[in-house]
């Protein structure tokens, strides 16, 4: 399973990338706002930092305008994935951009039917949102499993990119289900290393080692 970082924080992305943890990056207008950076400048910097796909989102509402924005974003770097919303206009833009050979990430997916349409329109990635479904008492993970099954049934090449990933449990569940990609904030990815028993065991080993009076570095 590939790990994408859901962030426009270049320093945070670089930290994870140095450990080989980054297979790609996703951004959105809210993350660009949080970064305080110009969208074209920060996206180019991220594209230069990582070799995998970097999703940059259009903001237009009409297909023709989405296509124009998408082409402009795609000029930033060859690893740009143009991010479009799962609306009828977004699907029209997806078809045109994908036919032009551009990577397209169709975002804000909340149903299997939407995911089917995105795959038929040539999406490179479909982004179902787990956490936002959980927020309204629906099962976000069930959607991931359903999309995985349907895509496998019909051999769609669109990759399932699980988004709105908020907890380490979300990541583990996506891995078990077979999501192709998860995208998560840096804090969630770093939290994958945490376990209370790891901390407890390390404390015990350190305490016992201190009692030996030894040093590994002294001959």
UniProtKB/Swiss-Prot annotation:
Species classification: Bacteria, Pseudomonadati, Pseudomonadota, Alphaproteobacteria, Rhodobacterales
Annotated protein name in UniProt: Probable transaldolase
Pfam families xrefs: TAL_FSA
UniProtKB keywords: Cytoplasm, Pentose shunt, Schiff base, Transferase
Role summary: Transaldolase is important for the balance of metabolites in the pentose-phosphate pathway.
Gene designation per UniProt: tal
Entry-linked NCBIfam families: fsa_talC_mipB
Keyword presence, Cytoplasm: yes
HAMAP family xrefs: Transaldolase_3b (MF_00494)
The enzyme's E.C. designation: 2.2.1.2
Species of origin: Cereibacter sphaeroides (strain ATCC 17023 / DSM 158 / JCM 6121 / CCUG 31486 / LMG 2827 / NBRC 12203 / NCIMB 8253 / ATH 2.4.1.)
Pathway(s) this gene product operates in, as recorded in its UniProt entry: Carbohydrate degradation; pentose phosphate pathway; D-glyceraldehyde 3-phosphate and beta-D-fructose 6-phosphate from D-ribose 5-phosphate and D-xylulose 5-phosphate (non-oxidative stage): step 2/3
Class of the enzyme per the UniProt entry, highest EC level: transferase
Cellular localization per UniProt: Cytoplasm
One cellular component term from this protein's GO annotations in UniProt: cytoplasm
Superkingdom classification of source: Bacteria
Similarity comment: Belongs to the transaldolase family. Type 3B subfamily.
Main location: cytoplasm
């Amino acid at each position: 399973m590939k790990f994408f970082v859901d962030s426009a924080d270049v320093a945070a992305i670089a930290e994870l990338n140095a450990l080989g943890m980054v297979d790609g990056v996703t951004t959105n207008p809210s993350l660009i706002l949080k970064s305080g950076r110009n969208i074209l400048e920060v996206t180019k910097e991220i594209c230069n930092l990582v070799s995998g796909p970097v999703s940059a989102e259009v903001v237009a509402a009409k297909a023709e305008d989405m296509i124009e924005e998408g082409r402009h974003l795609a000029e930033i770097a060859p690893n740009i994935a143009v991010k479009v919303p799962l609306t009828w206009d977004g699907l029209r833009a997806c078809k045109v951009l994908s036919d032009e050979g551009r990577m397209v990430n169709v975002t804000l997916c909340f149903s299997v039917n939407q995911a089917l349409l995105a795959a038929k329109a040539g999406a490179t990635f479909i982004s179902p949102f787990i956490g936002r479904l959980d927020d309204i008492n629906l099962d976000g993970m069930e959607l991931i499993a359903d999309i995985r099954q349907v895509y496998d049934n019909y051999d769609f090449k669109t990759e399932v990119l699980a988004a709105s990933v908020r907890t380490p449990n979300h990541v583990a569940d996506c891995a078990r289900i077979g999501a192709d990609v998860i995208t998560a904030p840096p804090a969630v990815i770093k939290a994958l290393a945490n376990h209370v028993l790891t901390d407890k065991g390390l404390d015990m080993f350190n305490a016992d080692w201190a009692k030996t009076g030894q040093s590994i570095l002294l001959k």
